[in-house]
Amino acid sequence: NKNETNVDNTITNMFKELTTNKNILFVLSANLSIEEMQNVKNLASKLNVDVSGYSPNTFDESFADDYLRTNDRTANRAAFKELQIDESKEYFDEKLNKASLVIIVENSYFENNANLLENKKVISLFSHHCMTIGYSNVAIPVASFYEKSGTYININGIKQKVISKMNKNNPMQSITTVIEDLKSMIEKGTV
């Protein structure tokens, strides 16, 4: 399948970038599942690199109402706290300043802040076409929210498991699969 070959080649290119860059920052979306966040965090730990959840653009004061009771437009921000992923501006600024490679995982912050990525290599993982892909050195398409399963923490702190019943023949890989493939390559030291 041509799509699988292209994705495999893209993952190989990402592996090469991960093994040749020392100062790496993963920037995660607060819409990822706990499993996706944990897998990225495990890979980052193996590589001894940094992970940030900074995403101030996902807050909207006009979004809250009597039912939602929050201005946070994300599905899983509480997972950052549970997994001890720093989402502060100070941490993000410090780590981004040092980074030579930035890996953006479904985080839309750079859509209007592309200038922050100048002189850096960029790898992006997105389920949809966006401006960030346009200035990425490597862009990996991943399954959308409706095509994947995972665990999310709701506004009341209750964990909810989401199970996808979408087309299982879809060639799009989940973020978890991409990250696990990369981790396996790194452990083996080869593509």
Labelled PLM ranges:
Residues N1-N23, A30, I34-V191:
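Non-catalytic alpha/beta scaffold blocks inside enzyme catalytic domains
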